[in-house]
A protein has these predicted regions:
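Carbohydrate-binding surface patches
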Residues: 623-626, 631, 668-738, 766, ...
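Aromatic-lined carbohydrate-binding/catalytic grooves of carbohydrate-active enzymes
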Residues: 219-518
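Beta-rich interaction modules in large eukaryotic scaffold/regulatory proteins
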Residues: 387, 395, 399, 404, ...
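N-terminal accessory beta-strand-rich subdomains and adjacent acidic, glycine-rich linkers
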Residues: 2-203
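C-terminal beta-strand-rich structural cap/linker in extracellular carbohydrate-active enzymes
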Residues: 759-789, 815, 838-864
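Flexible loop/turn segments at secondary-structure boundaries
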Residues: 232-236, 265-269, 429-435, 506-510, ...
Length: 864
C-alpha cells in the first residue's frame, strides 16, 4: 500500500479557497482576454471552460498541482460540438487579423519548425501551437491543440483569418461529436514564463507526460560524442567504428559517448531469404522498406571476434573506403532518378538507363568484395557454426563470448578508457519497415499506411513515400512491452547503454485496426518507457523524428531527451549548390524555436554536425551555447581538432550552459530566415553569467506554395544587429535571477576579442569599489561555461582593507577577467603566479594548465 502522500499514487483535489476571476471570457461571438477581443466570429458551437472547472483532480505531484492552480485564472479550454460523430472533425475557433504570431508547424511527418504571420489564414497545416502578441495589455496568449479522449488535434488555416482546429482519431472506427477540452489557451506578460505555465497546466491536467524538471537526463548531456551516420551511412562496421574513435583519441578529443547509427541491425526485404541480412546497403532510403528479421546485431557485428582490434598489429582499415562506397551509391541514386524522370516524361525505351544502373551496381558490389559479402555465419574455433535465435540470444554448444556486439563493446571500452556510453539506433517499430512477420517470436502483421489529411500540406519526403510503399511490419500493440524488452534487455547485456529511437511518428499511419493513433501510441510508448526504466537506467534514450504533439503529450513520462531540429544536412539533397550554406541556418532555426515548447518536456538535443564542414564554426558556436550535449558525425580523416578544442575539454566533457538556448524576445515574432533584416539571437545561462549567440541565418525557409524548404537568394547578404544584456532572461532560472539585478556587467565579445562594461536599465544596487567579473576561457566558444565556482570575500574587523575573489575554472588555456583595479596578488592552486592586466580596458589575463588529477579544475584567488 502506498503511503498517504505518495506523489506517484495520490490524487489531489482543488481546494475551496477563493479563486481569481479568469482572464478569458467567451461572449457575443468573441474570445476576450483581459477584456481585449482576441478571436472574432467565434461559432456558437464553440465553448470555453476555465482550467479549474475542468481539472478538479490530478495525480500529478502536489507542488506541480499547486503551481498549475496558482495560475489557473490565466488559462482555460476550448471545445466544440457537432451534430454528427466522425473520426475527423474540423471546426473554426474564430478569427484574428492584424496580430503578430509565432507558431510551430509540422513540415514533415516527424519534423516541425517556426512560422510567423499576422492572421489565422497565415497559419500552416498541422500547427502545434500559436503564440499571439497582445501589446494592448503587454501580454502574450498561446493556443495549444491537445488530446482529448481518443482524439488528438492540430490547428489549420481557415479563410478570412479563421483558425481551424482539426480533431482526429486515426481510425474510422473511433468517432466522436463533441469535445470540452480539445484546445488549451493561456496568457502571461512573459513569453518564456507563458510556456512554462501552459505546459505545467497541461501536465497536471492530462497526466500523460512529465516535465523535464521531473526527470533525470542521459549521463552524456555534458559530454562530447561521435555518431557514425555521416561517416558510414549503412556501411557501418566494427573496424570502421574503431578507426573513428581512434582518430578522435589521437587528435586529443576523445568521445565520451558513441552512437552507432542505422546499419548495425539484422534487416532484409520481403522478397529475400527471411534468415539472411540484406547486402551492400549504403544510402539512407535504400533500407526504408526493409524489416527486422531478428532482434540482435546484424552479421557485420556478429562476426566480430574478441580482441581482433586490440593486438599490436590489428587489421588495417582504409579510411577512404566509406566515402568511396557512398560516392558510388550516389551515382546509382542519380542514375535511378534520371530513369524515373525519363519515364515520367514519356520515354518508352529505358534500356540504356537500366544498363547503366546495373553496371554501377556491379561496380558497387565489387567494391564491397563481390561474393565475399555473402559469407556464412561466424565460426567458432572448433569449426561449429554459431546459431542465434530470434530474440537475439545465442544457442548451441559454441562459446559465444568470443564474437559479436558484446565483445566489440568490451574491446572498445578496454582500449578507449573514457568511453562511457555506447548507444545504437533503431526505429520505433524496429526498423524503418518494422519487423518481418514470421521471423521472430512476436505477433507481427504488415499494416498498410494511411496518412492523415493534415499531412497533405507537408513537404514531400522520401521516407514517407518508401514506408507507405512497403507498409509497416507492426508488432501487435499488446506485445509492445515484450518487443522492446526483448530487444533492449539483449542490448543491455552486450554493453549497450542506450538507444536512439528514430522514425517515431509512423504510428499515426497504422492506427486503423488498433483503436486509433492515440490508443496505439499509448501502448507503444508505455512499453518503450518500461523498457527504458528497466534496461537503460531510465534515461538512456534519445528520441528523434518525434516533433509532434502526440509524442510530446503521450510519450514522455520517462523519456527525457529529444531532437529539436531536422537532420544536419551537409548539402542540399535536392541539388541547390547554395544549400551547403542555407541549410545550416534552417537547422539552427528549427532547434532554437522548437526548444520553446519541447524544452519544457525534454532536454533539447541540437543534433550532430561535421567539424570539417564549411559552416562548422557556425554550428560549433550554436552547440557551445545550446545547453545540451555536443556531438559530431565526422567522416574518417575529416576532423578539425582546433575547432573541437574550442568546444570540448581534454577529458571529453564540455562547458555546458545551465539552461537551454531560446530565441531572444526581439526575435520571437520575426523571421530570421528570409525577411532580409533579422539576425537570430539565442540566449542561455551559465553558473556565473549569461551568454548570447548571434547568427546570420538568412537565405532559406518554408515556401507555402511549393510546400518545401528552399533557398531565398535575395537574402544572401551580410547582416547587422545589436545585443544587450537585457536580451538574457535571467529570471527563467532561479539560480540566475540575482544576476539579473546587477547594475553593471562585464561583456566579452568572443569573435572580436573585446571586453567592456555595460549598464542595463535597472534600479541601482550597491557595488564594491573594486569591480571584478570573470569571463572564462577565451579559447572556448562558451567562455563563461568554464566558470565552475565564484566567491567574493571582504576582510572585516579593525584595520581590514583587502578583499578577494575566488574562482574555480575547468579547462586549460587563456583565462580572462575584467577588473577595474590591479589585484595585489594572484594565486593559482595555492601558488602565487604572474598575470597580465591593462588599465585601459580592465583585461586580466593568465594561462591555465589542464590538470588531469583534478579533472581539469583550477582554483584562482585574486587579492585586492
Amino acid at each position: 500500500m502506498a503511503p498517504p502522500n505518495d506523489p506517484v499514487h495520490s490524487t489531489f483535489n482543488v481546494s475551496k479557497t477563493h479563486k481569481k476571476d479568469n482572464l478569458f471570457e467567451l461572449s457575443d461571438g468573441k474570445l476576450f482576454v483581459k477584456n481585449i477581443p482576441l478571436l472574432f466570429d467565434v461559432p456558437s458551437n464553440v465553448s470555453f471552460s476555465t482550467f479549474s472547472s475542468i481539472c478538479q483532480t490530478s495525480r500529478a505531484p502536489l507542488p506541480l498541482f499547486h503551481c498549475a492552480h496558482s495560475t489557473s485564472f490565466k488559462g482555460g479550454f476550448l471545445g466544440f460540438s457537432k451534430e454528427e460523430p466522425s473520426h475527423h472533425l474540423m471546426n473554426s475557433l474564430g478569427k484574428f487579423t492584424g496580430r503578430d504570431f509565432l507558431s510551430i508547424f509540422r513540415f514533415k511527418t516527424w519534423w516541425s519548425t517556426q512560422w510567423v504571420g499576422h492572421s489565422g489564414s497565415d497559419l500552416q497545416m498541422e500547427t502545434q501551437w500559436v503564440l499571439l502578441d497582445v501589446p494592448e495589455i503587454k501580454s502574450y496568449v498561446i493556443i495549444i491543440p491537445i488530446i482529448e479522449g481518443k482524439f488528438r488535434s492540430a490547428l489549420h488555416p481557415g479563410t478570412d483569418g479563421h483558425v481551424l482546429v482539426c480533431a482526429e482519431s486515426g481510425s474510422s472506427q473511433v468517432k466522436a461529436s463533441s469535445f470540452r477540452a480539445i484546445v488549451y489557451v493561456h496568457v502571461s506578460d512573459n513569453p518564456y514564463s507563458l510556456m512554462k505555465e501552459a505546459y505545467t497546466a497541461l501536465r497536471v491536467y492530462l497526466n500523460t507526460f512529465k516535465l523535464l524538471e521531473e526527470k533525470s537526463v542521459p549521463s552524456f548531456v555534458d559530454k562530447f560524442g561521435w555518431c557514425t551516420w555521416d561517416a558510414f551511412y549503412l556501411t557501418v562496421e566494427p573496424a570502421g567504428v574503431w578507426q573513428g574513435v581512434k582518430e578522435f583519441a589521437q587528435g586529443g578529443v576523445s568521445p565520451r559517448f558513441l552512437i552507432i547509427d542505422d546499419g548495425w541491425q539484422s534487416i532484409n526485404f520481403d522478397d529475400q531469404d527471411p534468415h539472411e541480412d540484406a547486402k551492400n546497403l549504403v544510402l539512407g532510403g535504400t533500407q526504408m522498406t526493409a524489416r527486422l528479421h531478428r532482434l540482435d546485431e546484424g552479421e557485420k557485428f556478429r562476426k566480430y571476434k574478441a580482441g581482433s582490434l586490440l593486438g599490436p598489429h590489428p587489421p588495417l582499415f582504409e579510411p577512404k573506403k566509406p566515402k568511396m562506397l557512398i560516392s558510388k551509391a550516389i551515382e546509382i541514386e542519380h542514375a535511378e532518378k534520371a530513369r524515373d524522370k525519363a519515364n515520367q516524361s514519356g520515354v518508352t525505351d529505358l534500356s540504356q538507363f537500366d544498363i547503366q544502373i546495373e553496371k554501377l551496381k556491379k561496380e558497387l558490389n565489387e567494391m564491397f568484395g563481390g561474393d565475399q559479402q555473402n559469407s556464412p555465419q561466424p565460426m567458432c574455433k572448433n569449426g561449429e557454426e554459431l546459431q542465434f535465435n530470434s530474440q537475439g540470444c545465442e544457442s548451441g554448444s559454441c562459446n559465444s563470448e568470443d564474437t559479436g556486439m558484446k565483445v566489440f563493446t568490451r574491446d572498445l571500452r578496454t582500449h578507449f578508457k573514457g568511453l562511457d556510453d555506447i548507444y545504437v539506433w533503431h526505429a520505433l517499430c524496429g526498423a524503418w519497415g518494422g519487423v518481418r512477420p514470421g521471423t521472430t517470436h512476436l505477433n507481427t502483421k504488415i499494416i498498410p499506411c494511411k496518412l492523415s489529411q493534415g499531412l497533405d500540406g507537408t513537404m514531400d519526403d522520401l521516407a514517407v513515400i518508401k514506408i507507405a510503399e512497403g507498409g509497416i511490419g507492426l508488432v501487435h500493440p499488446d506485445q509492445a512491452d515484450d518487443f522492446y524488452d526483448s530487444m533492449h534487455s539483449y542490448l543491455s547485456e552486450v554493453g549497450i547503454t542506450g538507444v536512439k529511437v528514430d522514425v517515431i511518428h509512423t504510428l499515426e499511419y497504422v492506427g486503423e485496426e488498433y483503436g486509433g493513433r492515440v490508443e496505439l501510441a499509448k501502448k507503444y510508448y508505455n512499453g518503450l518507457s518500461k523498457s527504458l526504466a528497466k534496461n537503460f537506467n531510465g534515461t538512456g534514450l534519445i528520441s528523434s523524428m518525434q516533433q509532434c504533439n502526440d509524442f510530446l503529450l503521450l510519450g514522455t513520462k520517462q523519456i527525457s531527451m529529444g531532437r529539436v531540429g531536422d537532420d544536419f544536412w551537409f548539402q542540399d539533397p535536392n541539388g541547390d549548390p547554395n544549400g551547403v550554406y542555407w541549410l545550416q541556418g534552417v537547422h539552427m532555426i528549427h532547434c532554437a524555436y522548437n526548444s520553446m515548447w519541447m524544452g519544457q518536456i525534454i532536454q533539447p538535443d541540437w543534433d550532430m554536425f561535421q567539424s570539417d564542414h564549411v559552416c562548422a564554426k557556425f554550428h560549433a558556436a550554436s552547440r557551445a551555447v545550446c545547453g545540451g550535449p555536443v556531438y559530431v558525425s565526422d567522416s574518417l580523416d575529416g576532423h578539425d581538432f582546433d575547432l573541437l578544442r574550442k568546444l570540448v575539454f581534454p577529458d571529453g566533457t564540455i562547458p555546458k550552459c545551465q539552461y537551454f538556448a531560446l530565441p531572444t524576445r526581439d526575435c520571437i515574432f520575426k523571421n530570421p530566415l528570409f525577411d532580409g533584416k533579422t539576425t537570430l539571437k539565442i540566449w542561455n545561462l551559465n553558473k556565473y553569467g549569461g551568454v548570447i549567440g548571434a547568427f546570420n541565418c538568412q537565405g532559406a525557409g518554408w515556401d507555402p506554395k511549393r510546400k518545401r524548404i528552399r533557398g531565398y537568394s535575395n537574402c544572401y547578404k551580410p547582416m547587422t544587429g545589436s545585443v544587450h544584456v537585457n536580451d538574457i532572461e535571467w529570471d527563467q532560472l532561479k539560480e540566475a535571477s540575482e544576476m539579473g539585478k546587477a547594475e553593471e556587467y562585464a561583456v566579452y565579445l568572443n569573435q572580436a576579442e573585446k571586453l567592456f562594461l555595460t549598464k542595463p536599465t535597472t534600479d541601482k544596487i550597491p557595488i564594491p569599489i573594486a569591480k571584478f567579473a570573470p569571463i572564462g576561457l577565451t579559447n572556448m566558444f562558451n567562455s563563461g561555461g568554464a566558470i565552475q565556482g565564484l566567491q567574493y570575500e571582504e576582510a572585516t574587523g579593525e584595520g581590514a582593507n583587502c578583499a578577494s575573489a575566488k574562482v574555480e575554472v575547468k579547462g586549460g588555456g587563456k583565462f580572462l577577467a575584467y577588473t577595474s583595479v590591479l589585484p595585489s596578488k594572484c594565486y593559482l592552486n595555492g601558488a602565487e603566479v604572474e598575470f597580465e592586466w591593462t588599465s585601459q580596458d580592465g583585461k586580466l589575463i593568465l594561462n591555465l594548465p589542464w590538470i588531469e588529477e583534478t579533472s581539469g579544475i583550477s582554483s584562482l584567488t585574486f587579492i585586492f
